[in-house]
Amino acid sequence: MGNKENFFEHIAQGYAMKGDYITMGAGMLDGETITDAHIKIPLKMMNRHGLIAGATGTGKTKTLQVLAENLSDKGIPVLLMDLKGDLSGIAQPSPGHPKIDERHEKIGLPFEPKGFPVEIMSLSEQDGVRLRATVSEFGPVLLSRILDLTVTQEGIVAVVFKYCDDNKLPLLDLNDFKKVLQYATGEGKKEFQSAYGRISTSSTGTILRKIIELEQQGADLFFGEKSFEVDDLVRIDENGRGFINIIRLTDIQDRPKLFSTFMLSLLAEIYATFPEQGDSDRPELILFIDEAHLIFDNASKALLDQIESIVKLIRSKGIGLYFVTQNPTDVPDDVLAQLGLKVQHALRAFTAKDRKAIKLTAQNYPISEFYDTAEVLTSLGTGEALISALDEKGRPTPLAATMMRAPMSRMDVLSDSEIKEVLDASKLIKKYNEEIDRESAYEILSEKIEKAEKEAEKEKEIKQTSRRTTSTRRSTRMNPVVKVLTSATFIRGVLGVLKKVIR
């Protein structure tokens, strides 16, 4: 182990920055904080993505809060997922505490309590700016991925989208999509078959069942209008600070499909909308995905490939993705390899499997002459973390056990009245919280089917009337025998014979 002076020099050189940066805290050696050995993250590398990991109660959420605050202060907007409901306090300044002052004195940083510009958003019926997307915007590829469809079923989904494009039928919500799917094998079977080929009823039945499963997780709340414009995520307030957009997800932890659907839709829309930026001095937007395992658990291979592709490509748009989870093994290796910043809080070894995971995690970090990484991972205290980042030239910085700085904002939830204040001040609620139900595929096809049914009924009535008329004509037209038997001549003749007999 090296001495303090060597360690300080090692950190000072490894974290020397020419451009703008965020200070995370100060390096630690043998459990002691080395004052002014500041651990800095260059802003220009923030679009290289990152990981914040650690056991429950080790300080992951506070680290997320620190990063979000400092990015906002630098004029960079942030989007973060609040699955536990404890991030809304960012809107209010920290009340302060002697322990915070003591921590910052050790780090060598002044502590300045402050609140930040916040926009509260929601995927469900919770209060906040409603986030929605139309099925058309989601597109056939993403919809097939999220439904985990076979190649044949993917083809049917593509045909449904093509039919709607060709016939100018807006696909706004899941009801629209289901209606077209039912129409394809019902009333519109001939129309579809002549234009796109035969569509299997069993395949459409499977797709319908998977859509119903998605609806049961609340996706019907997400699909629809008014569709959210991602440009509204990159707003700056009047003081030049980036808005921190907090999506309240406390009620969807048990609905991972909805979470995955939203995340993929959002990332795809951002990638399609934001201009190419390349390597610039600062990112355009940073996203923090809390409880990241919800995206990766039970995800199909196709879905994981989609996520990996987006992670690779989206950084060129100036977007940084930060996954927050308990264990780095929650994130697939191919995604983990794309992450430039790693903030690892303490891991707990209760089982042989845990110890194996810690050894694997230690191998993800640069070798350090000052630390036994596996040992440090289990001995870190709350609010301490191992940090490995990229310097301004994209090279790994020295591994540093770090005493993390405290958040400047409140480390607790907002009260109901404080949330109401934030919502009342929002400019986006007025824009997005009005539900629109314009004419779409469901209504147009329903009308088309109704019209066809009325015409069929009319034709049926005409045929029935025609039959009745024919029947009446037949009944009034005399049978020749009857005609003879009932004729006056025949009757008179018979009566004449009878008279003769009587005589």
Descriptions of predicted regions:
Residues 1-16, 28, 130-136, 376-478, ...:
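Conserved P-loop NTPase motor module
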Residues 2-3, 66-68, 91-107, 309-395:
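Conserved ATP-driven motor cores of ASCE-family P-loop NTPases powering translocation/secretion/packaging/pilus
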Residues 13-38:
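N-terminal pre-Walker A segment at the start of P-loop NTPase domains
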Residues 32-43, 233-235:
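Pre-Walker A adenine-sensing motif
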Residues 37, 45-50, 241-245:
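Pre-Walker A (Motif I) flank of P-loop NTPase domains
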Residues 52, 56, 299, 328:
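The conserved Walker
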Residues 60:
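Conserved lysine of the Walker
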Residues 68-72, 76-78, 85-309, 335, ...:
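P-loop NTPase motor domains
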